[in-house]
């Protein structure tokens, strides 16, 4: 079990008095002062700890308790109820969150440098552990983060670990024991992280991260909302419903990450455009996951496909649950793959505008996930009995291609020339 020997005091949280903008939205990472809780004697659990019954782990990652605090109420981009008289389309609802985060990030100058801050032993160990987790579960992404500055790299690791722990709550070994109440407690714990009161060492790394960077809490809340949706929903009537789910569980990651990765000072793109690209990459990745895992999800009684589009293609739940690869299924899958690729194309626009040292991880993710769609096609659209995966050799070949794409300069007068230069190589 990984733990520190004393309370983690983040220089960014405890020493800095940083306010990104006087107009920053409420409950964002706008810190004037922070307090840290002390470790509970005897290793007792905090009120906001989230554990499955009979287990000392949170998902698959275990860390020792530090303490907790009451949560503050917050808004949530909740899924519409079936009886709502007027339902705002999911894309519009998500766009409001994008605008909120973009406005917060725009208040911090793109030319501002994230200066190195000495870390005490406890916080250094916390970030090191986050790096270990990232290396274990996302080897390719971990490798790509090595080009980033240490401050940005460690912050991305901290965000990755929090997202993984959150996902493990409903998709990990203890998922059958997780309830909506447990997710409520996890959200309370999130509030404490943003308030500078981490519960364990992994929380401390994220608490330090949100104190250093203009990160909005809303995407984190929304990811937890996606976990709630997974507990109670196994069908999606339309792509509008599926879009909201994909935003919750994956699009949020892009919105969390851009403030850390940073937008290139040379970029002429609007901040909102970059965030839309990050959102699109998250949506594309999740849609790809869904198309890859159709058979696996069906065996769990879940269908993450638009019901109305299945019906228009002449397909039913029974066809999916029985795993029938028919001409109708192939036609349906072609349309779903085309949609995912459209999101990948939109993601490219945002990836080019990031800081140069941050582009390689993003391009690596984009190119690798897009290859999964190629593998589904190569399997003749049989994603029931054959799981599409990218062979290791292709993954390794994608990394230098991603690196070359990362060298394309942001939107400027020389962008077209730069793209032509590298297009023949990638």
Curated annotation (Swiss-Prot):
Offer a single GO CC term for the protein.
plastoglobule
Tissues with expression: Expressed in roots and endosperm.
Q: What is its main location?
A: plastid
GO annotations under biological process?
Answer: carotenoid biosynthetic process
Pfam families reported in the protein's UniProt record: SQS_PSY
Report the GO molecular function annotations. 15-cis-phytoene synthase activity; geranylgeranyl diphosphate synthase activity; squalene synthase [NAD(P)H] activity
Presequence extent in this chain: 1-52
The question of whether Plastid is a record keyword is answered with yes
Q: Does the keyword Plastid apply?
A: yes
Enzyme class, spelled out: transferase
Q: Give the EC number(s) listed in the UniProt record.
A: 2.5.1.32
Q: Which PROSITE patterns match?
A: SQUALEN_PHYTOEN_SYN_1, SQUALEN_PHYTOEN_SYN_2
Q: What subcellular locations does the record give? A: Plastid, Chloroplast, Plastoglobule
Recount the UniProt induction comment for this entry: Induced by drought stress, salt stress and abscisic acid (ABA) in roots.
Reaction(s) catalysed by this chain's protein: 2 (2E,6E,10E)-geranylgeranyl diphosphate = 15-cis-phytoene + 2 diphosphate
Instruction: Spell out the disulfide connections.
Output: none
Keywords of the record: Carotenoid biosynthesis, Chloroplast, Isoprene biosynthesis, Plastid, Transferase, Transit peptide
PANTHER family for this protein: BIFUNCTIONAL LYCOPENE CYCLASE/PHYTOENE SYNTHASE
Q: What role does this protein play?
A: Catalyzes the conversion of geranylgeranyl diphosphate to phytoene. Mediates the first committed step in carotenoid biosynthesis. May play a role in regulating carotenoid flux in response to abiotic stress in roots. May control flux to carotenoid precursors that are required for abiotic stress-induced abscisic acid (ABA) formation in roots.
Q: According to its UniProt record, which protein family does this protein belong to?
A: Belongs to the phytoene/squalene synthase family.
Protein name per its UniProtKB record: Phytoene synthase 3, chloroplastic
User: Species name for this entry?
Assistant: Zea mays
Organism classification, top ranks?
A: Eukaryota, Viridiplantae, Streptophyta, Embryophyta, Tracheophyta
Which gene is annotated as encoding this protein in its UniProt record? PSY3
């Amino acid at each position: 079990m990984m733990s520190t020997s004393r309370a983690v005091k983040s220089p960014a949280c405890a020493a800095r008095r940083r306010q990104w903008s006087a107009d920053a939205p409420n409950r964002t990472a706008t810190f004037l002062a922070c307090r840290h809780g002390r470790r509970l004697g005897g290793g007792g659990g905090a009120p906001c700890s989230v554990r499955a019954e009979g287990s000392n782990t949170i998902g698959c990652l275990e860390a020792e308790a530090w303490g907790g605090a009451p949560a503050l109420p917050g808004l949530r981009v909740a899924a519409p109820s079936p009886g709502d008289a007027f339902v705002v389309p999911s894309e519009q609802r998500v766009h409001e969150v994008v605008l909120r985060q973009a406005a917060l990030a725009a208040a911090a100058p793109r030319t501002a440098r994230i200066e190195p801050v000495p870390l005490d032993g406890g916080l250094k160990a916390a970030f090191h552990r986050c790096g270990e987790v990232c290396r274990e579960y996302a080897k390719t992404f971990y490798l790509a983060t090595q080009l980033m500055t240490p401050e940005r790299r460690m912050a991305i690791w901290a965000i990755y670990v929090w997202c993984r722990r959150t996902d493990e709550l409903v998709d990990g070994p203890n998922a059958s024991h997780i309830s909506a109440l447990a997710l409520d407690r996890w959200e309370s714990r999130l509030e404490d992280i943003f308030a500078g009161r981490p519960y364990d060492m992994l929380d401390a790394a994220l608490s330090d991260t949100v104190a250093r960077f203009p990160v909005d809490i809303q995407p984190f809340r929304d990811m937890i909302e996606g976990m709630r949706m997974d507990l109670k929903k196994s069908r999606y009537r339309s792509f509008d419903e599926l879009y909201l789910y994909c935003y919750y569980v994956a699009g949020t990651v892009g919105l969390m990450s851009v403030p850390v990765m940073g937008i290139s000072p040379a970029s002429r793109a609007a901040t909102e455009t970059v965030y839309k690209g990050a959102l699109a990459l998250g949506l594309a990745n999740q849609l790809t996951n869904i198309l890859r895992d159709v058979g696996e999800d069906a065996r769990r009684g879940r269908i993450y496909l638009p019901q109305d589009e299945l019906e228009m293609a002449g397909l039913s739940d029974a066809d999916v649950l029985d795993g029938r690869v028919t001409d109708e299924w192939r036609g349906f899958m072609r349309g779903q793959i085309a949609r995912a690729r459209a999101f990948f194309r939109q993601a490219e626009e945002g990836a080019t505008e990031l800081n140069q040292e941050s582009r390689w991880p993003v391009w690596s993710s984009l190119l690798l996930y897009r290859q999964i769609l190629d593998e589904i096609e190569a399997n003749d659209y049989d994603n029931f009995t054959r799981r599409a995966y990218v062979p290791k050799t292709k993954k390794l070949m994608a990394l230098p291609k991603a690196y070359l794409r990362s060298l394309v300069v942001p939107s400027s007068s020389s962008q077209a020339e730069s793209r032509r230069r590298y297009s023949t190589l990638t």
